Design a protein with these regions (language model features):
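Short helix-initiation/N-cap motifs at beta->coil->alpha
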Residues: 50-58, 169-176, 252-264
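Short, solvent-exposed loop/beta-turn-alpha elements that line the ligand-binding surface or hinge
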Residues: 103-112, 155, 167-169, 213-237, ...
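Glycine-centered hinge/linker elements that transmit conformational signals in sensory
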Residues: 174, 178-183, 217-255
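Paired acidic/hydrophobic, glycine-rich loop segments that form the ligand-binding mouth/hinge
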Residues: 70-74, 269-274
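Conserved N-terminal structural module of periplasmic/extracytoplasmic solute-binding proteins
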Residues: 1-88, 340-341
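Extracytoplasmic/periplasmic solute-binding protein
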Residues: 8, 67-73, 122-146, 154, ...
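Extracytoplasmic/periplasmic substrate-recognition and gating elements
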Residues: 283-352
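Hinge/lid segment of periplasmic solute-binding proteins
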Residues: 1-3, 10, 51-53, 81-144, ...
């Protein structure tokens, strides 16, 4: 009782308004959860603002110096995990091993935690990161989709109804995708077939549909080996198709989170990216009429894949005053608002899709 637990999230710029980046259902309910936990345990949850461009370096350098600025760390995304774990070659010494605190926290319940994805948070046999389940619109927000400009594709001979029919019948393949991308590429009018999406989402979707993995990991005798595997036979098939598109002049290589603005320009036929970009596109008053398809599959007989290559990892720092309390609070505060079986999950999805 009486303790203050510090919580760092890269998106928080104002400690008095730390929820603005969250989905609506979280914005509405997380403050209540925070207040309930503070009252129940007699603690204070203090948000640490991010005032640095390289937030991970800020947090980890402070811990490296022996003066951690936070107890609980929002890990940003999977891209940051390895750097956080092995910052300055520390091999996890700046983080707590969550599995060592099983008397205080349980991260093994799939009703609350993404246990399969959590495997990526294990290094050398110990768990350093917890990955909570998602709720509401987040269930589909990070799935990969293909968003298309209806007007551009129709003028190229591919009306929306025809595309939806291909999608539904299982004929939306790499070959059809290539055909459509070429058809709506016109250097004279400045239109181009497909944008690569946020952080080259297109190649991620091609990898997924080909059954390739860019990174693989294997743990033997308590030691984890992570291998970069962009050159397997399956991966090379994806690269070859991507290069073929590029050689035909049908690829717009601009990428990063500005992919929404790129699509809103109206001169890009398709964009492979996260489903949550649809929310941003729809909220714009100047958006072109758009449709949504699965990312293309390699062959007709294959299944469609809409992979989720993003999740939110959480960690607790070492060298803090109450490590057991921090891990326990992480398991309570960073867990989703509702369990996977809670009917409020589906209700919140429907409510947010209607907004």
């Amino acid at each position: 009782a009486g303790e203050t637990y510090r919580y760092f999230c890269w998106a928080v710029k104002d400690e008095n308004d730390p929820y603005s980046f969250e989905p609506t259902v979280v914005q509405e309910n997380l403050p209540k959860k925070r207040a309930e936990l503070e009252e129940q345990y007699g603690i204070t949850i203090k948000y640490i603002i991010n005032d640095a461009q390289d937030w991970a370096a800020k947090v980890m350098e402070a811990s490296l110096a022996g003066t951690p600025i936070t107890d609980i760390l929002h890990g940003g995304g999977p891209f940051a995990m390895l750097n956080i774990y092995n910052f300055s070659s520390t091999g996890g010494r700046l983080l707590l091993q969550l599995d060592e605190y099983s008397d205080y926290a349980d991260f093994s319940d799939p009703s609350w935690w993404r246990t399969e994805l959590q495997q990526s948070g294990y290094f050398n046999g110990h768990q350093y990161f917890a990955v909570p389940n998602v709720i509401g619109i987040e269930h589909v927000a990070l799935n990969q989709v293909c968003i298309f400009n209806k007007s551009l594709l129709e003028s190229a001979g591919y009306p929306a109804d025809k595309l939806y029919e291909m999608n539904q019948s299982g004929e939306w393949t790499w070959d059809k995708f290539y055909e459509v991308a070429i058809s709506c590429t016109n250097p004279d009018t400045g239109t181009i077939g497909v944008n690569v999406g946020d952080s080259f989402s297109l190649i991620h979707s091609l990898f997924s549909s080909a059954g390739a993995r860019a990174v693989t990991s294997e743990t033997k005798d308590g030691a984890t080996e992570v291998t970069f595997t962009p050159n397997t036979p399956e991966a090379l098939e994806a690269w070859d198709f991507f290069i073929k598109l590029g050689q035909a002049g049908a690829v717009d290589y601009r990428h990063a989170s500005g992919d929404v603005e790129i699509f809103l320009s109206g001169n890009v036929g398709m964009i492979c990216t996260y489903f949550n970009r649809v929310i941003n596109i729809a909220s714009s008053k100047r958006h072109p009429e758009y449709g949504i398809l699965f990312p293309p599959k390699q062959e007709v007989e294959d299944e469609y894949t809409s992979d989720v290559n993003w999740f939110t990892p959480y960690a607790a720092m070492s060298q803090i005053s109450n490590p057991a309390g921090a891990v326990q609070l992480l398991s309570l505060y960073c867990a989703p608002l509702y369990s996977a079986e809670d009917e409020r999950n589906q209700a919140s999805v429907e409510a947010e899709l209607m907004q």
